[in-house]
């Protein structure tokens, strides 16, 4: 049923598209900057190794000197959607209230007026159905973006995301590609209670075939969204509810960020701190205290939750020999547990201390603000962990 509906939608979209519209691969006039800076650091034994990291903050600073414009994070996501929908008539958006209401956090505001109700499609409150419709649309050649009004609601679409979205390319023997983006708000911090404060990274990471990324700044939110839309793989983009109103100057020119590269946030020598999403800011707050105490932490926003950028992570570990992982995900079965396992498998010989991992408590998120804060990692805990690991 989902495939049949998608076929009708595809026919309507392609019929409405301009005859002069160019396919994605044929765009000689587009100037797209793929940001991927490389620099050298000293590893154990004095050898020089190359560190590949997407340095969004450095590039954004450089761009700010020559122009650019300030946007909030949710506006950066919207810019990415508009640019990709203008360029490619197969890009479409599905979800609850994504149309004229503009989405629960206004990421899709104005898109229905610009592109019509067919390409920006309001759906019933039936996550399993519209996720399946998105998979069917992708099978028929469209590039759907499926918004969950809240990431916790996508548990109702877990069957479609797991058995169809993630596995169809494999189970069809490569006959189908599933270029779909699944995105939406999640995370802890707005006193929304247990159901609305879900962190589904731990649920989705075990699904074969899915890529997962988490944005943390307006710059990388736009760059990752554009890259996810262009990917031939199904991509889950995690957005944190407390980061939507972050403001940053981003370039006027078009750019994308690599889906599989981490970002070097702060170079350092004493310990590698790996984090992502909202916890990036807790880590940077802790880093100020640590510097005053004489420590020099290296902070990496891993961004790619699946697969991990083990090149960037490994080069940092070879320099600092100590690792602290900070996440908002649950401790049991979380991203931190998988990352710790990958580090042990690949870089055990470079470690001078046990890997430490700070995660959220394995409890449902409370409503009360004080209790909510107690369930997630705070900057003081990060400072204490670094002091312990560097003894």
Curated annotation (Swiss-Prot):
Residues bound to thiamine diphosphate: 127
Cofactors required: thiamine diphosphate
InterPro entries: THDP-binding, Transketo_C/PFOR_II, Transketolase-like_Pyr-bd, Transketolase_C
Binding site for K(+): 180, 228-229, 233
One Pfam family per UniProt: Transket_pyr
Gene Ontology MF terms in the entry: metal ion binding; pyruvate dehydrogenase (acetyl-transferring) activity
Annotated EC: 1.2.4.1
Primary localization: plastid
CC terms in the record's Gene Ontology section: chloroplast
DNA repair among keywords: no
First and last residues of the transit peptide: 1-35
Alphabetical keyword list: Chloroplast, Metal-binding, Oxidoreductase, Plastid, Potassium, Pyruvate, Thiamine pyrophosphate, Transit peptide
Cellular localization per UniProt: Plastid, Chloroplast
Record field: catalytic activity: N(6)-[(R)-lipoyl]-L-lysyl-[protein] + pyruvate + H(+) = N(6)-[(R)-S(8)-acetyldihydrolipoyl]-L-lysyl-[protein] + CO2
One example of a Gene Ontology biological process annotation: pyruvate decarboxylation to acetyl-CoA
Purpose of the protein: The pyruvate dehydrogenase complex catalyzes the overall conversion of pyruvate to acetyl-CoA and CO(2). It contains multiple copies of three enzymatic components: pyruvate dehydrogenase (E1), dihydrolipoamide acetyltransferase (E2) and lipoamide dehydrogenase (E3).
Subunit structure: Tetramer of 2 alpha and 2 beta subunits.
Protein name: Pyruvate dehydrogenase E1 component subunit beta-3, chloroplastic
Species, as recorded: Oryza sativa subsp. japonica (Rice)
């Amino acid at each position: 049923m989902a495939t049949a509906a998608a076929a009708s939608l595809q026919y309507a979209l392609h019929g409405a598209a301009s005859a002069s519209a160019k396919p994605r691969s044929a765009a000689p006039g587009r100037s797209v900057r793929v940001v991927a800076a490389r620099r050298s650091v000293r590893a154990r034994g004095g050898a020089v190794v190359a560190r590949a990291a997407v340095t969004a903050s450095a590039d954004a600073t450089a761009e700010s000197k020559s122009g650019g414009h300030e946007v909030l994070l949710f506006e950066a996501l919207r810019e990415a959607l508009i640019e990709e929908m203008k360029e490619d008539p197969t890009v479409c958006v599905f979800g609850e209230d994504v149309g004229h209401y503009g989405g629960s956090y206004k990421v899709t505001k104005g898109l229905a007026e610009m592109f019509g109700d067919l390409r920006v499609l309001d759906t019933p409150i039936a996550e399993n159905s519209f996720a399946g419709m998105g998979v069917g649309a992708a099978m028929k050649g469209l590039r759907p973006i499926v918004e969950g009004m809240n990431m916790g609601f996508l548990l109702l679409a877990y069957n479609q995301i797991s058995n169809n979205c993630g596995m169809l390319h494999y189970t069809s023997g490569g006959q189908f590609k599933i270029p779909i983006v699944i995105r939406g708000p999640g995370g802890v911090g707005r006193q929304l209670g247990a159901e609305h404060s879900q962190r589904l990274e731990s649920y989705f990471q075990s699904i074969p075939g899915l890529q997962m990324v988490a944005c943390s700044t307006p710059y990388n939110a736009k760059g990752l969204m554009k890259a996810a839309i262009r990917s031939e793989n199904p991509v889950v983009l995690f957005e944190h509810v407390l980061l939507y109103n972050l403001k940053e100057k981003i370039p006027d020119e078009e750019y994308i960020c690599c889906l599989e590269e981490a970002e070097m946030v702060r170079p350092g020598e004493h310990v590698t701190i790996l984090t992502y999403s909202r916890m990036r800011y807790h880590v940077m707050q802790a880093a100020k205290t640590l510097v005053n105490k004489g420590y020099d932490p290296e902070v990496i926003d891993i961004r790619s939750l699946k697969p991990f950028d083990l090149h960037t992570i490994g080069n940092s570990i070879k320099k600092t020999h100590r690792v602290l992982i900070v996440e908002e995900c649950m401790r049991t079965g979380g991203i931190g547990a998988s990352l710790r396992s990958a580090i042990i498998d690949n870089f055990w010989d470079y470690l001078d201390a046990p890997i430490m991992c700070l995660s959220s408590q394995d409890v449902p998120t409370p409503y009360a603000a004080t209790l909510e804060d107690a369930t997630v990692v705070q900057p003081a805990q990060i400072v204490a962990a670094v002091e312990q690991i560097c003894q």
